[in-house]
Amino acid sequence: MNTKIYKRVFALAGELMLAAQERNQINFDNCYSELKQLCDDNENTDKDHPVQWETLADFTDDLPLAISIYEKALLKAEEINSKDFRSSIGFSVASLQVELGEKEQAIENL
């Protein structure tokens, strides 16, 4: 993964956590929008990587939307044959599916 992009994703994740802890919705929305734009700009380029999509999904409040973003991240992890990312993303999807009462689908993702 491009180091500059990784550092920006990491910084945005920290800013998103801080905004969430401070209940600062404006800062949260701004950081989320920037992260989403970064993902969109890099999609299907050599800078595309599952970590940016997984991070975006981590901060997505709408659970079905978060699952769809995780699924995109999972496809990207499969493309680079990353077992670590596939495991992490699969666990996140399964956790959300349990929250949504979709236990059978959750088991399939583990």
Question: PLM features: what roles do these ranges have?
Answer:
Residues R8, L12-E15, P50-W53, G90:
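TPR repeat positional signature
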Residues R8, N27, N44, D48, ...:
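Structural signature of alpha-solenoid helical repeat junctions
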